[in-house]
């Protein structure tokens, strides 16, 4: 069985399960594993027993933080599933998994429809062009509305859903689905508690009379959409002939793989209804590794030279390391997607990103945190490798004779930070180890040493992100430490252009001295477009020898780590080196580096420096009677209301609010709405801090 799959990639699906937090993603994954025979007992998220939530904190909090990889089989097809987190603080995990997937199942809450994080994850999937099917979950929930959810897929995502199923019954009476492809009803036992097969058995019945008209209407839309994919089908359609089930499925597959439509199915994973037809849809409609374009990379010697690697086991080996985890026995586990070629344990490969040779130890296919050893890793599959020394997320492993660098991943900068202080000298050593390991695993976790206070500062994507990292330091690395209050990661930038800023670095002490003269122009860049720094060399006629130019650049970049206003990192600066002078004996790389640092500080002081703060896109769902209080509160937090809409019995308010005003917001929101409102937030952009607020921040950081 497994051997066939290794050679026949049409029988492989690499998929992700993506959604908003609490839409039922992990429960859906658990059901998939149960029905495919990997699990003999269903693990419930609310019991803290699910297979893919294998870290202690995940089991306590009932949320998924790391994207565990699980392999299972359904109808002769191998499905490699990555269960991705829905919480906004863990977007890096989502981004990583989408980079290596071929398709995804987007899970929506049947009552809430498209929620903010569903939208974020959907846009991330758009970025990597990942074909998707939609599963409207929680159809048994009070207020669940399948048709409303389909409308939000159009309204909020701008996507084109293709409805393949209709729900039979709603809320407590939800018992099954109408299959519009084969025009039949699939009905599960009414009492799921008394069902000893846990939903594994269901009956095929006639479509209920009260749904017949609606089923015909949606079936007609489905057939019309499918007929447009092929001239022969279109002729058949216009001639009034019936399309066969095979023709309909082939048409849906073609449209899904091209991301032109998104098939929509429904069910209740918790009540064990609708999961098997969704698995059928994964096999029938989502792409195999052969359906997606060959992966692109570039030559090691020339970034402009594009190289492609087709999913073929006889081609040169190429794989992308997309995640690193620490295993209690094996140490570092490197999760990889093999794009081409194959390797066996003991093979030497090159880390093309770093130019270093590595020897692969053991190979595993993972089932959450259980590992199944394999004899070779082949194209189109996902594995965990051990024994690699110097590999980080986004590195390419490739054949030594045919190296290639695959497109890596870009990760957002952290927006929040806390100071962490070990309690004893022993804790200091443990903290260093913990930080190194955690930073290897998570590219959005950054660490710096505050030069003034000597404190270690850790940075992340949100309060929950940092909470969990600190928690892991305590549990896994036994670090006892005092943790400060969360602080906002401010930045500094400049608002106007300053020309011909000069600095002369001159030092004369016995023997050779130091000399470097530079003249520069500094101007603002558009940080909203991601332009953080640019260096241009316009020196002519050898006024500064070529070997000293990079030193000026390095000096500027060093000085940008701490801005002139309050010591926050400086961004959005274009630095142009115009002129300068050097001394045959006294000039050195160090002298020009110091001159670069000092000229930047001088230039920035004259370029109208300002403070920037992270703005969060906040969405609040509140009953109508609290709407006024919610809006008033957001305004008092310097928020700008962006929109107000209705959604299934509640009002949805979206606003841009500075992160600094949102600490403790959840408690205030609960008390203002008697615990009935919920909110979510995600990073939107950096914006200038109003002058009066900036003055307070600057005074505080200077200790005035």
From Swiss-Prot:
GO biological process: ribosome disassembly
Any single GO CC term annotated in Swiss-Prot or TrEMBL for this entry: cytoplasm
Source organism superkingdom: Bacteria
NCBIfam families (UniProt xref): EF-G, PRK12740.1-3, PRK12740.1-5, small_GTP
UniProt xrefs under SUPFAM superfamilies: EF-G C-terminal domain-like, P-loop containing nucleoside triphosphate hydrolases, Ribosomal protein S5 domain 2-like, Translation proteins
GO molecular function, one term: translation elongation factor activity
Annotated binding of GTP, by residue: 19-26, 83-87, 137-140
Keywords: Cytoplasm, Elongation factor, GTP-binding, Nucleotide-binding, Protein biosynthesis
Gene behind this protein: fusA
Name under which the protein is recorded: Elongation factor G
InterPro entries: EFG_II, EFG_III, EFG_III/V, EFG_IV, EFG_V, EFG_V-like, EFTu-like_2, G_TR_CS
Family: Belongs to the TRAFAC class translation factor GTPase superfamily. Classic translation factor GTPase family. EF-G/EF-2 subfamily.
Transmembrane stretches, start-end: none
Compartments, record wording: Cytoplasm
Location of the tr-type G domain: 10-290
Main location (coarse class): cytoplasm
Its job: Catalyzes the GTP-dependent ribosomal translocation step during translation elongation. During this step, the ribosome changes from the pre-translocational (PRE) to the post-translocational (POST) state as the newly formed A-site-bound peptidyl-tRNA and P-site-bound deacylated tRNA move to the P and E sites, respectively. Catalyzes the coordinated movement of the two tRNA molecules, the mRNA and conformational changes in the ribosome.
Protein source organism: Beutenbergia cavernae (strain ATCC BAA-8 / DSM 12333 / CCUG 43141 / JCM 11478 / NBRC 16432 / NCIMB 13614 / HKI 0122)
